[in-house]
Each structure stands twice: as C-alpha cells, then as structure tokens.
Amino acid sequence: MARACRERAVLRWAAVALVVVTAQMFVPGAHAADPADIAEGMRLFRQKGNCQVCHGWAGDGRKMDSQMPDGANLRESMLDRETLITIIKCGRPGTGMPAYDKFAYSDGRCYGLKQADLKSPTRQMPDPPATLQVREIEAIADFMFAKIIGKGTMDREKCVDYWGSDVELCSELAK
C-alpha cells in the first residue's frame, strides 16, 4: 500500500513537471538562453547593432552620444520576447528606433507597412548602423532578457553580473 502511494506521488510530480515544462514552451518570453548566445548578444548590442549609443551600455536610456535620439529605459521594460524581437526587426516608425531587418518594409511584414508608407514625416525612421540576421536579433533579445529587461536600476552588483567582473564602470555605482 505504501509503495503504491509513493508511486502515485512520483507520477503526480512527474505529470506536474511535464505540464510546467510544456507550458514554458508556449509562454512569451519563456526562453532558456545559452550562455554563448548571451555573450554573442552582448557583443552585437554593443558593437554591430550599436544599441548602447541610444539606450546606454546598461540599457537604462542614458545614451552615449548626444547626437543620437533618446532610447527607452529597457531596464524598466515589461516587453515580452516576441514583442522585443519585432521592435528590433521593425523599429518603431516615427521614433528614433531603426529597423534592423533588411527587408522590414519591403513586403508589409512589419506592422503591415511598406517603404512608401514611411515617407510621411510622422513615420520616418533612421537607418540602422547595420542590418541584423534573425539569429543575431534573437541573440540580442537573449542578452537583453538575461542582463537588462526588467532588471531595475543598475547598481554595483548588477554591473559586475553584467560585465562578468568588477570593471571600473562598476566602482562608480552604489552597492
């Protein structure tokens, strides 16, 4: 009898675990990122995408170039992964956020708009520093969810986690 109860309990826990794992596959933003993807995403955020110029190195909206538009404070963002990827691919017409998908407005894939629709002064967008492939956009999203999105104000502990060591920038932040 006790053995049968234990077996049922084990089966129940296994069923619950299966449901949780399966549900995570369908929840927006629930994505287990590989550490190598996170590192590559950070490199792309800082270099090829040059996201830090508008959003700041910490993603807090403190831009690094006064000539660039103000970027959103991503540390306080509540975006899900799918929406973030769409914004990186398609930009945000009428704002300073460029579209990193080379074909974003060639066929209506972004917000149902085409290149001709962006000629209106209220929908104009800057050109990105470079276009990105889907895998690169996904790596940036992985990095942002691991180190920036929803992480709150940058402090020394988060800075060390962000860089992987106690770099000089971190010493300027409160503990």
Annotated model-derived regions:
Residues M1-L11:
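N-terminal secretory signal peptides that target proteins for export/translocation
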Residues W13-M25:
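Bacterial N-terminal signal peptides
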Residues F26-A32:
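Sec/Tat signal peptide C-region and signal peptidase I cleavage site
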Residues A33-A39, Q47-G49, T95-K175:
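Flexible coil segments in periplasmic/lumen-exposed cytochrome c-class electron-transfer proteins
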Residues E40-M42, D60:
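Residues within alpha-helical segments
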Residues V53:
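Short, cysteine/histidine-rich loop/knuckle motifs that typically chelate Zn2+
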Residues W57-K119:
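Gly/Gly-Pro-rich "capping" loops immediately C-terminal to redox-active cysteine motifs
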